[in-house]
A protein has these predicted regions:
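Rossmann-fold scaffold of SDR-type NAD(P)-dependent oxidoreductases
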Residues: 47, 114-124, 144, 168-172, ...
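Conserved glycine-rich cofactor-binding loop
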Residues: 43, 50-51
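Conserved glycine-rich Rossmann-like NAD(P)H-binding loop of the short-chain dehydrogenase/reductase
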Residues: 64-80
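Catalytic loop of short-chain dehydrogenase/reductase
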Residues: 124, 128-132, 163-221, 228-245
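Non-catalytic terminal and boundary segments that flank Rossmann-like NAD(P)-dependent oxidoreductase
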Residues: 1-43, 179, 297-318
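C-terminal helical subdomain
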Residues: 7, 248-287, 301, 305, ...
């Protein structure tokens, strides 16, 4: 590691450690007005709902009066969630690393005829090693971005996302380190693979997609927000960032504080003054903090074109 890399690391952690941890959450929440969510009559779809942030969001939605479809890969964890949540929560097993599984989820939702009022694109993975799915894609790209795009576009195209519906995309503060780069999304080089870097590129793309969707569907009164939870003690952090976790474990956020903004956004649906923003601790924040991430040869349109073509490639092969 050279001096330039060390300087970037020190600058990043120096800037964000207090804000992104439980310390920042505890300080800010003292100034918040109390909100009693009322989600009565709403149906939510929460991805990656079997644990961590997704589980907390699904349970909070049920407690607010919503009915919830919880989708995740682990049938065992989904069963445990359903037992805790009660009859207002239904589960569907879906591996969001796979386009085929996500397509089957869309088909099942269409057959049930259940319109979605709130979609939370929460599922995500941060991996140590380069792996590919059975469909030949880098696993974290497929999970963190491609099937988010597929699911959201599919719900809208099928008329399953209600007019006036809400989409919340779960990003990460890691996106602050990188610009939009379509080329970096589906990492082809196993030798040069960095799970942390790949995760950051996927999460930056989520931010760009959110702005794109909001522009495109504003006439239908749909709301699209992207947020990040701060630094939460998730399974991905435990698995892929053990040193980071060991140093900061005592101040990492739990699932409830990490997911608070998602519930608040759904309950209040605030107006977003800036076209581009990422929500964090109940406030719209800038999507760039470093000048180097503002400049990219790619645009929202090139990103959407790439994801659309990637989905079409597998459909044509089938």
């Amino acid at each position: 590691m050279n001096w330039r890399q060390l300087r970037k690391i020190f600058a990043f952690y120096g800037r964000f450690t207090v804000s992104f941890t439980q310390i920042g959450y505890a300080a800010r929440r003292m100034l918040w007005s109390r909100v009693q969510p009322d989600f009565s009559g709403q149906h939510w779809l929460v991805t990656g709902a079997s644990g961590g942030l997704g589980r907390a969001i699904a349970l909070a939605a049920v407690r607010g009066g919503a009915s919830v479809t919880a989708a995740a890969r682990s049938a065992e964890k989904l069963a445990a969630l359903a037992a805790e949540a009660g009859p207002a929560l239904a589960t569907i097993r879906c591996d969001f690393a796979l386009q085929q599984d996500t397509e089957q989820l869309l088909t099942l939702l269409q057959q049930k005829g259940r319109r979605i009022d709130v979609l939370v694109n929460n599922v995500g993975v941060l991996l140590d090693d380069f792996t590919t799915t059975d469909e030949g894609r880098e696993t974290s790209f497929a999970t963190n971005l491609l099937t988010h795009f597929q699911l959201t576009e599919g719900l809208i195209a099928r008329g399953l996302l209600a007019d006036g519906g809400l989409v919340i995309n779960m990003s990460s503060g890691g996106m602050y380190n990188v610009p939009l780069s379509v080329r970096a999304l589906n990492a082809p080089d196993a030798q040069a693979y960095s799970g942390v870097a790949a995760y950051g590129f996927h999460k930056r793309a989520q931010v760009v997609l959110t702005t794109y969707w909001q522009r495109r569907h504003a006439s239908r009164r749909m709301r699209f927000y992207v947020m990040h939870p701060g630094w939460a003690d998730t399974e991905g952090v435990k698995r892929s960032m053990p040193r980071f976790r060991r140093i900061l474990k005592s101040v990492l956020r739990d699932a409830w504080s990490g997911s608070d903004t998602a519930i608040w956004l759904a309950a209040t649906r605030p107006t977003q003054a800036a076209e581009e923003a990422i929500w964090f601790d109940r406030k719209a924040r800038p999507v760039h903090v470093y000048e180097r991430t503002r400049h990219s040869a790619d645009t929202a349109e090139t990103l959407v074109a790439y994801l659309t073509a990637e989905l079409a490639r597998l459909r044509e092969a089938a």
